[in-house]
Amino acid sequence: MACGYGCPLTDKDSDIIKRCPLQKVAVWPSRNRFFIKGILAAITSRYENIFIRGIIFVDFSIKHVRYFLNYSWITYLKSTGFNIIIVCDAYMEALANYWMEQDSAIKAVITNRKKIKEIKGIINRIIYGAVSPRKIRLYSLNHDEVRFLELAVSGKSLLSISTEMNTNIKCIYNIKQSLRKKIGISLNELLTK
């Protein structure tokens, strides 16, 4: 996690979280310095004097795809008690929409296609506690596609994925093709980015 003071990401009952002077604004995973600086500059300067429950901005970029293929990352971030906002690139939008449909702790998915005014509106609603309607997303992965992606990223062959998912190889090829359409790049390109 990264806030302006480098506070570690801990459980919501931790003294570190309760004493955070930056009103609990965090970025996870905290590997991209520019992403962290941009988020903190935009949020802390605008909302520093307001009590907010806490927000974690998730750097949901393609280079972090391995983090987001099972539910453990959501469990980890939910333990803080913070609201979760996913900031994703175009390739990861379908996966981000899938996770938003799976868990209400994820309050929004922000993509590079949204205008600044729309992004500010989303963040305002979350900070001030307004309830946003949860829309069904057009481009969202399904459970089988996420499971396939998890197995493929772990290095399994299509045949072993077929066995593990208890389905025939033709169905696996259909899932692979569906993923390509929703993500916008091939599986090979996804794994090499």
Question: What is the predicted function of each stretch?
Answer:
Residues R134-C171:
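Helix-turn-helix DNA-binding segment
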